[in-house]
Structure formats: structure tokens, C-alpha cells
Amino acid sequence: MNIRIENPKDYREVENLTREAFWNVYRPGCTEHFVLNRYRTSPDFIPELDLVMEEEGKIIGHVMFSKAEIILDDGSHFPSWTFGPISIHPDYKRKGYGLKLLKYALEKAKEMGIGLLQMEGNIEFYSHAGFDLASKMKIHYHAEPSDSEVPYFLAQELIPGYWGDREGTYCPPKGYFVADEQPEAFEAYEATFPQKEKILQPGQLPQFCQRCGMPLTKKEDCGTNADGSTNFDYCQYCYHDGRFLQDCTMDEMIEHCSQFVDEVNKQMPKPLTKDEYKQMMHGFFPMLKRWRKDG
């Protein structure tokens, strides 16, 4: 086994590895390979921590790191770092390679003076590399209430005392949202790879219509593209044959959805009034793809 810095001749192979590693894991298809492709030219990218793992001369794993920041409660910006995607070829998963690659990368990061990392992931895996809930360090996740314990948001202080007793909020760097911000570029890039079937399946992250917020739990819930294929971003009530069924603003969509608050309340631990539901949606909708720029 060998771990080394990625070089340009590895790029396509590593992007294909990343695509294979993430396909249909967290969502139908994946975008992580496009994130990696675009991140290499970002000022946040850290070339010294762009690492590949080889086994018998074959690249079987990869990880990249990025600069990030935390907004402290006084409004100032505190330097931190994040990492990912971290990819292991499907044939080598669950054999300890991912943890070996990560621990090696963390040691290199510490040697470079990187004091604090935060990321989204499964604590059952990442705790073996020293990560714990970020809320224990008073680091809040931008998309969740500041007083909540977010089970997937993790952090680790690599240099003792670097973070200290500070408190602040973390938002992932913009580079991780490039597929949402450049959908046409992503589709063109994705078309350069062999076609693979996208599947909506149990175990993935919860999927929501990126326009109305409706949960997407099965293929039949989803909209359709102009060629008749499934569109996993939008529901059948919002998107059909490659177009939105009607134009509206975000506020108009929230007003429309609020009519169904009684149905929503069947899934809620505590019933919401119509006004409470609308207030909640004003926090949620700006994170949806259709409204992200407006938000």
C-alpha cells in the first residue's frame, strides 16, 4: 500500500473512482466527482493534502482537503479546514483502507499546522479517527438550530487549544455546491462518463423536491425530464416533461404549501399552525435548489 500526492495524470482516474464510490450512496447518482473536478482550481484547495492511495500500483482511494471558516458570535471569521470527498473503490470498501487513508491525511494536516477540522459524516466511522459531535465544541451547523445536537456534523481539534472556548457557526465552502450552482456544466461533465442508472433507495439521505419540499421516497414521486427519464430533483407535481408546471416566487410556493399544513402535522411530533409552518418554510426553502439564489 502506498499513499502519495495526486498528480495531473491521475485526475480522470480519480474522478471516475470518486463517481464509482459515491454513486447512489447518499442520493440518486452523485455529484462528488464534479466537486473534485472543479475544486482543484479553487483557492481553497490544498494540493499538499490531495492524496491518492495505491494497492499494487492501482489507485483505490482518494481524499482532498479544503480551507474553510467559522463565523464567530462576534461576527469575525475564524480559519478552519474541512475535507472530502474521501473515496474508496467499491471493491476495497469495509477493509480498513478508508480509515488508514484518513489517519495518514490527518497526520499530514497536523504537520502543516491545520488546527481544526469540521465535516459532515457518520460518527460511527469517523470517531475512529478522533472526530466527535461539533456541538460539543460549540460549533454550530448553519442549516440547523444553534441549540441542536446535529448527529452528522463532526469536528476535531488537531492542535490542542487551537479552537479554545470559542463559539461559532460553520457553513461548508461554496465549492461543495458547484453542481447546484452550475447544473448545465455538471450535466455536460457527467455526459463524458459511461451512463449509469440513478436509483432512489432506502439508506440514502432524505430526498426532497427542490421546489416545494415534498419528500421523495420512491421513483413515482419524482418528476420527468423532456426525454421521459426520471428527474430526481423535483416532484411530479412541480416538474413534468422537462419543465415546471407553473411559474411562481418562493413566497407564493410557501403560501401554496401552507394549505396542506394539516397533512404535514400528521408527521410532526407537535402540530404547527399555518403561520408557524410558513415561518419554518422560510428557513427551509432558501436551501432548496430552485430557491437557493433567491434566498
Feature-to-residue mapping (PLM):
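Conserved acetyl-CoA pyrophosphate-binding loop and the N-cap/start of the following alpha-helix
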Residues: Y92, G96-Y104, I114
